[in-house]
UniProtKB/Swiss-Prot annotation:
Keywords: Carbohydrate metabolism, Hydrolase, Magnesium, Metal-binding
Amino acids binding substrate: K151
GO molecular function: magnesium ion binding; phosphoglycolate phosphatase activity
GO cellular-component term (any): cytosol
Cofactor requirements of the protein: Mg(2+)
Native source organism of the sequence: Pyrobaculum neutrophilum (strain DSM 2338 / JCM 9278 / NBRC 100436 / V24Sta) (Thermoproteus neutrophilus)
Catalytic activity: 2-phosphoglycolate + H2O = glycolate + phosphate
Keyword match Magnesium: yes
Alphabetized SUPFAM superfamilies for the sequence: HAD-like
Protein name: Phosphoglycolate phosphatase
Listed InterPro entries: HAD-like_sf, HAD_sf, PGPase
Length: 228
């Protein structure tokens, strides 16, 4: 018996590298191999739900974790794992002058994304945000969301929903915002992952980003990953 579910990050994991948005052909072929083997694939991303669902459609994936775990779309239904109004937080963050809003914020519900304009943008945003919210970086953007929400919490929710032990779920990622799901599931970090992601994972493959994801799928299909 092997992995039943594969949760995979998008940016930096299915892409050619951590500083491009171009998808890796090797990663796409590996994703197809996992699907063909009967593994349920879930796309887990910091991106907004509409964007994530669009990308997932072209990947042949139905289930999505979006906004860093604030939203889960499974079996055609969307579930909110967060609550609250982010407008006041958004105003406080923009008032720092350290970031610019992501174009996706118009359609994001709970996890807001920002483009850093200065080197210490993360620190300045943290200082501006009141307790009860998390500020972190995916390497592509700075994210602010309600405390307690992350990809790890979403994976735990997903496991309960599917009736599957988290030990039978593999997760592959590259960044700090992936650390939660890498620790919750049978985590695999790609070779160029952040130190936080590597520490959280059960295994670290050698290849970077998309090539690393291919190695991760090889490991999964060979029976080298997942345990109850």
């Amino acid at each position: 018996m092997g992995c039943k579910v594969l949760v995979v990050d998008l940016d930096g994991t299915l892409t050619l590298s951590r500083n491009t948005y171009e998808l890796s052909v090797e990663a796409l072929l590996a994703l197809r191999r996992a699907r063909d083997a009967g593994i349920r694939v879930v796309l887990a991303t910091a991106n907004g739900l509409d964007f994530a669902l669009t990308v997932a459609r072209y990947l042949g994936v139905r289930d999505v974790i979006a906004e860093n775990g604030c939203l889960v779309h499974i079996d055609g239904e969307t579930h909110e794992l967060c609550s609250g109004d982010m407008s006041e937080v958004d105003r406080a963050v923009l008032a720092t002058g350290a970031v610019a809003p992501s174009h996706q914020n118009k359609c994001r519900r709970f996890d807001l994304a920002y483009v850093p304009l200065v080197e210490n943008a993360v620190e300045r945003v943290k200082a501006a945000v009141r307790p009860g919210y998390v500020v972190d970086s995916s390497g592509y953007a700075i994210h602010v969301r309600p405390a307690g929400a992350d990809k790890g919490a979403a994976v735990r929710w997903l496991c309960e929903r599917l009736g599957v032990s988290c030990g039978w779920v593999a997760a592959v990622g590259d960044s700090d915002v992936d650390a939660g799901m890498l620790a919750t599931a049978w985590g695999i970090a790609v070779g160029n992952a952040t130190e936080a992601a590597k520490r959280a994972a059960r295994a670290v493959v050698r290849g970077p980003s998309g090539l690393g994801f291919k190695e991760a799928v090889d490991l999964i299909l060979s029976g080298g990953a997942c345990a109850p």
